[in-house]
Amino acid sequence: MNILDEYLKEKGFITNKEAEKLGIKRYKLAELVHKGKLERVKNGVYKKKGDIDDELVLISYNNEKVVFSFHTALFLLGLSDRIPNSFHISVPQGYNVGHIKKRMNNIKVHYIKKENFDIGIITVKTAFGNEVKCYDMERSICDIVSERNAMDKQIFVDAITGYFNSKGKNMRNLIKYSRILGVEDEIRKYMEVL
């Protein structure tokens, strides 16, 4: 169980496939669940018994096409201090999210044109130290500007002012993304004001 302990300490979760790569058979995982040492989180995914679930990892685990966006990305990037009450994910148009929605009922899905999906994807750490994919600050700002009428005004204002006051902002990418995503005029208005 030493290899497994180290893996779980680093990653938090393990899949059947990952366990097999480490030389741990599936029946051994089932045995550890039965003994109360592991907990089955979902089909083929296990964690140490008693560990706190990192819901962001659970949502994105084995879902390569899931990227956290909108409110969730703003929170992960430090542009919002409000913990989202539902997780906002973006997927390419045509991607089937039924398996995710079946497990989690607090998901808001945004379907993105395939040609725009990969723009601004980065990897960030969750509060638990696990890595997940989300859109960068510039893409997130473009996204919320495009959906500003559907957003909570305070979250929107905090994110916009937080971005323009941020030392890590990349104005070149902001303009580039805004042009591709069709919100350049709106972005330029905010740039003039802030």
PLM feature segments, named:
Residues 1-13:
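Short amphipathic alpha-helical interface segments
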Residues 2, 16, 27:
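TRNA-binding/sensing appendages of the translation machinery
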Residues 14-17, 33, 47-194:
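Nucleic-acid-binding surface
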Residues 21-34:
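Short amphipathic alpha-helical interaction segments
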